Design a protein with these regions (language model features):
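Short hydrophobic/Thr-rich beta-strand motif most characteristic of the beta2 strand and flanking loop
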Residues: 47-54, 62
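Receiver (REC) domain active-site loop signature in two-component systems and cognate sites
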Residues: 77, 89
Length: 144
């Protein structure tokens, strides 16, 4: 089996507004392997540290065991959905301050009630540029 090689260009590191000197950390929860790899590369190239998981349960564990600055989650995943993950984040005293971006292939009108607790909603297919813009906007709002 051929190994996958990903080359990431050198870039400026984005420093966490919460903890100066530490790269901003994005928790990425996405069950689609190809999309997850694409977003990992996009985020790393933009200077973010990425903790990447394939389902909501792993995301919950990662959120509790890492210094996360923002959560990007798919709405529909195995084991624990993005909606349940968002509720978990909002109800956890140590995590409730984190911005959450929900990704979904469903139309926004179909998922509005479930995505209400998310800070932003992006429809799939999501471009790297729109995700980075959304992250930057939410982090700027959080630090002001």
């Amino acid at each position: 089996m051929a190994q996958e090689k990903v080359t990431i260009a050198e870039t400026d590191i984005r420093v966490s507004p919460a903890e100066s000197g530490r790269p901003t950390c994005v928790l990425l929860a996405e069950d689609d392997r190809a999309l997850r790899r694409f977003l990992e590369v996009v985020l790393a190239r933009a200077g973010y540290r990425v903790v990447s998981v394939c389902d909501g349960l792993e995301a919950m564990k990662a959120a509790l065991s890492n210094q996360i600055d923002i959560v990007v989650t798919d709405a529909v995943m195995p084991n624990l959905s993005g909606h349940e993950l968002c509720r978990f984040v909002r109800n956890s005293p140590s995590l409730s301050h984190l911005p959450v971006i929900m990704l979904s292939a469903l139309e926004r009108k179909e998922t509005t009630n479930e995505a209400e607790q998310a800070d932003a909603f992006l429809s799939k297919p999501v471009s790297g540029e729109s995700l980075i813009e959304c992250i930057e906007k939410l982090l700027a709002e959080k630090s002001s």
